[in-house]
UniProtKB/Swiss-Prot annotation:
GO terms for cellular component: cytoplasm. GO terms for molecular function: glycerol-1-phosphate dehydrogenase (NAD+) activity; glycerol-1-phosphate dehydrogenase (NADP+) activity; metal ion binding. Binds 1 zinc ion per subunit. Pathway: Membrane lipid metabolism; glycerophospholipid metabolism. SUPFAM superfamilies: Dehydroquinate synthase-like (SSF56796). This is Glycerol-1-phosphate dehydrogenase [NAD(P)+]. InterPro entries: G1P_dehydrogenase_arc (IPR023002), G1PDH (IPR032837), Glycerol_DH (IPR016205).
Length: 334
């Protein structure tokens, strides 16, 4: 069964409508999962800080919800992911109240606390207060663009899986995911960005819904996400001091993967330029240096990305470091 949000509110002062939405859903006693910086957006409900919750014990995490009829996640990625997980394990409805817009986790059924990610259910309601979101750090909002443009290469990878491995594919989910990305890119390339936070939130929610439709992360996560996960591995392996975000890494990864598709004749030059220029338009990174990684690290990440997850992508069985360097140079990432 496909579960998508019953209520989606994306507007100024939307957080003031949380009690109304709870009432509409006949929910009386929610538990709020939030952070110390976002606690101020919680009104009148019991809460717990996300970093006080032990997430490794998946079976007992449901006990946090035993005295409540619903879970609300207020904040960025981690409070919302933990809220989704508790709601899933306790079989209680989940409401997502994002305070920034850096990835599609605000609406998707995916929990990314571990690798591989964990499938739950999409939120029953999403309440996105634009007054709050537009005040979040610009770096987070530009990271959201990186997460959205990655839909283009993710869907190409999914289509490749269908062709080369007879993988199940959803036309409606794939088309929806690509259209969301194209519309946001078109907006940032042809406007003054005044409405960017609202447009971004709408796109991220749409991306999350495309995942719910497919019941898979495929429409929004492909080889560019494997590249991002590889960079995370490099950070730990070499103790790299960088503040690069998931969405930023996915954006750069999208350019690298798009270059491969370009060389195979499966992506137009105009599309590649649109991807790159839309990232630049919101000041998202497009080079290794802007991400905070040395050339050799980026090369190692791209050449090893295929090993991070058993998922068929354009990387197939992997590429050599020499080929990775060539791709990264041609796409001007290094």
């Amino acid at each position: 069964m496909i579960v998508i949000p019953r209520y989606t509110i994306i507007k100024e002062k939307a957080s003031g409508r949380i009690p109304e939405i709870l009432d509409n859903l006949n929910l009386k006693n929610p538990l709020v999962i939030t952070g110390k910086n976002t606690k101020k957006y919680n009104k009148d409900f019991d809460f717990i800080y996300y970093d006080e919750i032990e997430t490794s014990d998946l079976e007992n995490i449901k006990n946090y919800a035993k005295d409540y009829d619903s879970i609300i996640g207020i904040g960025g990625g981690r409070p919302i992911d933990i809220g989704k997980l508790i709601a899933h394990k306790s079989k209680k409805p989940f409401l997502s109240v994002p305070t920034t817009a850096s990835n599609d986790g605000i609406a998707s059924p995916i929990v990314s606390l571990t690798q591989p990610s964990y499938m739950t259910e999409a939120p029953i309601a999403i309440i996105a207060d634009i007054d709050i979101i537009k005040k979040s750090p610009k770096k987070l909002l530009s990271a959201g663009m990186g997460d959205i443009v990655s839909n283009i290469t993710a869907v190409l990878d999914w289509e490749l899986g269908k062709i080369e491995k007879s993988e199940k594919y959803s036309d409606s989910s794939g088309i929806f995911s690509k259209t969301i990305a194209i519309e946001l890119m078109d907006y940032v390339l042809n406007s003054n960005l005044e409405e960017y936070p609202k447009k971004l939130v709408k796109a991220l929610i749409g991306s999350g819904i495309s995942i719910a439709i497919a019941h898979s992360s495929r429409p929004a996560s492909g080889s560019e996400h494997l590249f991002s996960h590889a960079l995370d591995t490099m950070k730990e392996k070499y103790d790299i001091d960088t503040t690069s975000l998931h969405g930023e890494q996915c954006g750069v990864g999208t350019l690298a993967i798009a270059q491969i598709y370009l060389e195979e004749g499966k992506l137009e030059v105009e599309t590649f330029e649109m991807l790159k220029n839309s990232l630049k338009a919101v000041d998202a990174p497009v080079t290794a240096e802007q991400l905070g990684f040395d050339e050799e690290i980026i090369i190692e990440a791209l050449s090893s990305a295929n090993t991070l997850r058993k998922r068929h992508t354009i990387l197939r069985n992997g590429i050599s470091k020499e080929k990775a360097r060539e791709i990264l140079e041609k796409s001007e990432i290094i």
